[in-house]
């Protein structure tokens, strides 16, 4: 059964089953980050340092992180995050330039319906516009999780499409 065909509790149960597989081993540098083979297979990936850095930020925010292998030629999410028994699938998008969020979110929808944006700084008005546009254009999108420095912000579809999104998000983002 394909993971994409599952919804709700069945989807969460399948993620829990995947995360519970014996092939996942904790990384020596962090007991809350797991990967297939303990990181040996991932460490040759050129994206490994940024994947590991974002995983470490997730651990700081209370998640257990399961780093998923990325087979060549296939678009797959990067992580399973678990916190308080809730399992979620995320695709990492590092944001390093201006006017790039829209493009990175567009790329992520092919890999999953939750995106993780790891960013140092970004124009709030542009970010609000890009996130709202993402949820309007892609009805399957569920959540955008943002790591900005030591802060974590979760944006759901409902929040992004609400009338007060800009004001509430600005208050949280510009702390």
Language-model segments: residues:
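Metal-dependent nuclease catalytic core centered on acidic motifs
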Residues: 2-65, 95-175
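Short, solvent-exposed polar/charged micro-motifs at secondary-structure junctions
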Residues: 75-80, 154-157
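A short acidic/basic microdomain associated with nuclease active sites
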Residues: 59-73, 77-78
């Amino acid at each position: 059964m394909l993971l994409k065909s599952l919804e709700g509790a069945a989807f969460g149960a399948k993620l829990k089953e995947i995360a519970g597989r014996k092939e996942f081993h904790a990384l020596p540098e962090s007991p809350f980050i797991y990967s297939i083979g303990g990181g040996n297979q991932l460490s040759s990936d050129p994206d490994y340092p940024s994947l590991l850095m974002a995983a470490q930020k997730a651990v700081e925010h209370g998640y257990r992180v399961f780093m998923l292998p990325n087979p060549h030629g296939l678009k797959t999410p990067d992580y399973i995050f678990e916190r308080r028994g809730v399992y979620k699938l995320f695709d990492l998008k590092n944001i390093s330039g201006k006017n790039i969020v829209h493009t990175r979110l567009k790329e992520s929808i092919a890999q999953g319906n939750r995106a993780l944006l790891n960013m140092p700084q970004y124009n709030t008005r542009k970010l609000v516009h890009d996130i709202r546009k993402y949820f309007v254009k892609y009805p399957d999108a569920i959540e955008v999780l943002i790591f900005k420095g030591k802060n974590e912000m979760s944006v759901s579809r409902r929040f992004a499409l609400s009338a007060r999104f800009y004001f509430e998000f600005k208050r949280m983002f510009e702390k």
